[in-house]
Amino acid sequence: MVKIKKPEKTPRFSAAGVFLFCVVILTGFTCCMTSVPATLTYSHPFYVRDVPFYPGEDYQCGPSVLASVLNNLGYDIVPEDISREIYLRKVKGTLNIDMVSFARRFEDITVTEFYGDLTLLRENLSMGYPLIVFVDLGIWSIRKGHYMLVVGYDDSIGGVIVYSGAEKDKVIGYKEFMRMWERGGYWALRIAKE
């Protein structure tokens, strides 16, 4: 008589086992993610308060952030007025040189264009100067230039606080911000009263 060996059972995943696996994986991933509180309270000295916010719509980020800074200095101007003068339809945007030239039209202000780093950014913010920066939001070789207004930074959450497009007080992690800013050439613009 020949004995036939029963085939071994292949392990099956029980519903409870799959559920437990998913819980462990998801819990592990959420522990690695940085969470930012829904409402941030900026009580540190590195947030420039009361800077007007103009949402940048349809490639109008340059005129929007420029209007924010100029209004913060007491000039009554809206992004549409700036856009009529410096927005270039062919490039769907505004050039850095035109941003600088427009700001220099105003009396009793100093316009400083520079190539910065995180230290210079922090120094300017701690002196109360919001900074216009040019970043590249594109991926790989696809370029997508964008102006942001940096209004603060917070080391406790590890990021800068910006006005970007339609978002006010958007927090961007240092690593991501520096990557975008590097692709934009680390260009920054400070506009201040003399």
Predicted segment positions?
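An acidic helix/loop motif centered on a single conserved Asp/Glu
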Residues: V65
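Positively charged N-terminal leader segments that act as targeting/secretion signals
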Residues: K6-L20
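Bacterial N-terminal signal peptides
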Residues: F19-T30
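Beta-rich catalytic cores
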Residues: E57
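Conserved active-site-adjacent core of cysteine acyl-enzyme catalytic domains
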Residues: C32-P52, L70-N72, D76-E194
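Active-site-proximal loop/helix segment associated with metal-binding centers of metalloenzymes
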Residues: C61
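Short, low-complexity, intrinsically disordered N-terminal modules
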Residues: M1-I4
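N-terminal compositionally biased, intrinsically disordered segments and leader/signal-like regions
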Residues: P11, G28-C31, S35
